[in-house]
């Protein structure tokens, strides 16, 4: 009877340890995948492609066009600004 109890307890311990090990492996793989995805996103965000997309979007935006029109009007009509850095570029 004692041998059967020891066998059952050791079998249960073995099963629980296998389940725990599998859960840890799954967790480690999940963390590794998230870290890999994060690194790829950071690498993409630092790429020239994203920079070009952002610059193009800013240059084509209505706000930038309006700002350029305001600067042009100021540089044309305000005498003090004609020789400023704002109007030289």
UniProtKB/Swiss-Prot annotation:
According to the UniProt topology, which residue ranges lie Cytoplasmic? 1
Q: What intrachain disulfides are recorded?
A: none
Range of residues in the leader sequence: none
Question: What residue ranges lie in the Extracellular compartment?
Answer: 23-89
Q: Topology relative to the membrane, per the entry?
A: Single-pass type II membrane protein
Keyword tags: Host membrane, Membrane, Transmembrane, Transmembrane helix
Q: Which compartment or compartments is the protein found in?
A: Host membrane
Asked if the keyword Ribosomal protein belongs to this entry, the reply reads: no
Where do transmembrane segments lie in this chain? Answer: 2-22
A Gene Ontology cellular-component term: membrane
The keyword Transcription regulation appears for this protein: no
What is the protein's major site of localization? host cell
Protein known as: Uncharacterized protein 43
